[in-house]
C-alpha cells in the first residue's frame, strides 16, 4: 500500500517542449519507517511499480540528467524503466533461475544476473560511490576486497544515489569509495610478464585441450564479448565494461592489429571498386561501339532493301519462264488471281 503524497505523474508540456514523464515516489504504509523496502516508485500511465533498490542497481538503468537537490526523490523516467524491464525479460536470475534479472555482476566478463532480493540471499556485495553516485553489485565469486567503502547487501541503512552524469542528486558529498576490484585487475596487468607467459605456455593450453576445456573457455570469452558489445551499443555499459575493453584492446595490442587489418580491408575494397569501375567503363565503351555498329548495319540494310524492290522479286529462272509465256496465259493467270 502506498500513501498518496505526490501529484499525478504524466508527460507535461511547456509550450512546444514536452517534459519527460518520471516515476513517482511513494512510501509503503505498512513497512517500518526507514526500511529499505518502503521506498517504491510507480507510473500511473504505464502501470509500473518498482522498488527503489531494484531501480538503482539495475545494470541498464540510470537516472535522468535533471537533479532535484531539495529532496531525495530519484529521477527515473518511465521510458527508461520500460526499456530496462524489456531487457530483463531475456535475463535469468543466477539464484532463482527466473526471468527479469536486471541486476548484473559489475565485472565485465561475469555473466551472473540477479533480482535484487536474490542478490541479497546469495550474499552479493554492494558498492556505492558517493562522489559519483554509482551503484555496483558483485557476485560472491567476484567479491572485491572489503574496505570501509564496501557494504553488504544486507545493510538496510545504506543511502543510494545514482545519476546519469555521475553526480549526487541530494545530500552532502560522501567520501569516495574505492573500487578494489578495479585495483585488483590493474594489479594483475602490472604483474611481471613471466607469470602471464607461464600461464599461457603451449603445454598448459594442450592440457586444457585434452581436458576439453579450451573450446569452453573460448566460447565463454566470445559470449562475454557479445554481452559487453550489446551493452556498449545500448549505452548501458558499466565502468568495468569499459575498463575490460580497454585492457583487452590496448594492453595486448589487439586494437593496433585490428586497426591495421581493417585498413588493409578498406584499401583492398577500394582497389576492387576502382577495378570494377574500370571494367564497367570498358563495358560502357563497348556498348557504345556496338550501338554505333548496329546503327550503321541498319542504314546499309535499308539501302539494300530499297534497291531490291525496284527489280523483280522472282528468281532469274522463273523470270525467263514467265517472259516466254503468251500474253493470253499471262492474262489468264492474272484473272485467276
UniProtKB/Swiss-Prot annotation:
UniProt protein name: PHD finger protein 11
Single GO molecular function: zinc ion binding
Zinc finger region(s), PHD-type: 91-143
Subunit structure: Interacts with BRCA1 and RELA.
Keyword set includes Metal-binding: yes
Compartments, as annotated in UniProt: Nucleus
SMART domains given in the database record: PHD
UniProt keyword list: Activator, Metal-binding, Nucleus, Transcription, Transcription regulation, Zinc, Zinc-finger
Zn finger residue spans: C2HC pre-PHD-type: 25-61
GO cellular component: nucleus
Function description: Positive regulator of Th1-type cytokine gene expression.
Disordered, as annotated region: 145-196, 301-337
Superkingdom of the organism of origin: Eukaryota
A Pfam family annotated for this UniProt entry: zf-HC5HC2H
Polar residues: bias regions: 301-312, 323-337
Compositionally biased tracts (Basic and acidic residues): 187-196
Amino acid at each position: 500500500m502506498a500513501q498518496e503524497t505526490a501529484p499525478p505523474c504524466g508527460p507535461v508540456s511547456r509550450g512546444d517542449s514536452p517534459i519527460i514523464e518520471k516515476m513517482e515516489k511513494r512510501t509503503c504504509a505498512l513497512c517500518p519507517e526507514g526500511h529499505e523496502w518502503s521506498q517504491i516508485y510507480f507510473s500511473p500511465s504505464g502501470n509500473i511499480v518498482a522498488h527503489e533498490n531494484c531501480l538503482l542497481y539495475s545494470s541498464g538503468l540510470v537516472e535522468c540528467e535533471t537533479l532535484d537537490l531539495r529532496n531525495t526523490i530519484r529521477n527515473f523516467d518511465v521510458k527508461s524503466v520500460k526499456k530496462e524491464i524489456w531487457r530483463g525479460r531475456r535475463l535469468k536470475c543466477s539464484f532463482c533461475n527466473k526471468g527479469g534479472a536486471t541486476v548484473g555482476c559489475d565485472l565485465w566478463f561475469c555473466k551472473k544476473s540477479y533480482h535484487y532480493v536474490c542478490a541479497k540471499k546469495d550474499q552479493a556485495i554492494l558498492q556505492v560511490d558517493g562522489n559519483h553516485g554509482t551503484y555496483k553489485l558483485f557476485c560472491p565469486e567476484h567479491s572485491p576486497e572489503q574496505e570501509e567503502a564496501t557494504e553488504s547487501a544486507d545493510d538496510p541503512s545504506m543511502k543510494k544515489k545514482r545519476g546519469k552524469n555521475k553526480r549526487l542528486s541530494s545530500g552532502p558529498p560522501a567520501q569516495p569509495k574505492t573500487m578494489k576490484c578495479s585495483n585488483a585487475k590493474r594489479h594483475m596487468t602490472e604483474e611481471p610478464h613471466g607469470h602471464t607467459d607461464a600461464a599461457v605456455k603451449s603445454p598448459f593450453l594442450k592440457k586444457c585441450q585434452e581436458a576439453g576445456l579450451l573450446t569452453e573457455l573460448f566460447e565463454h570469452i566470445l559470449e562475454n564479448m557479445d554481452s559487453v558489445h550489446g551493452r556498449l551499443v545500448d549505452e548501458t555499459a558499466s565502468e568495468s565494461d569499459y575498463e575490460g575493453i580497454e585492457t583487452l584492446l590496448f594492453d595486448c595490442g589487439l586494437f593496433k592489429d585490428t586497426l591495421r587489418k581493417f585498413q588493409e580491408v578498406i584499401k583492398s575494397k577500394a582497389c576492387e571498386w576502382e577495378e570494377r569501375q574500370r571494367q564497367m567503363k570498358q563495358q560502357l565503351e563497348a556498348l557504345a561501339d556496338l550501338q554505333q555498329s548496329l546503327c550503321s548495319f541498319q542504314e546499309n540494310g535499308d539501302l539494300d532493301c530499297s534497291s531490291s524492290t525496284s527489280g523483280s522479286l522472282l528468281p532469274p529462272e522463273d523470270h525467263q519462264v514467265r517472259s516466254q509465256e503468251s500474253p493470253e496465259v499471262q492474262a489468264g493467270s492474272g484473272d485467276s488471281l
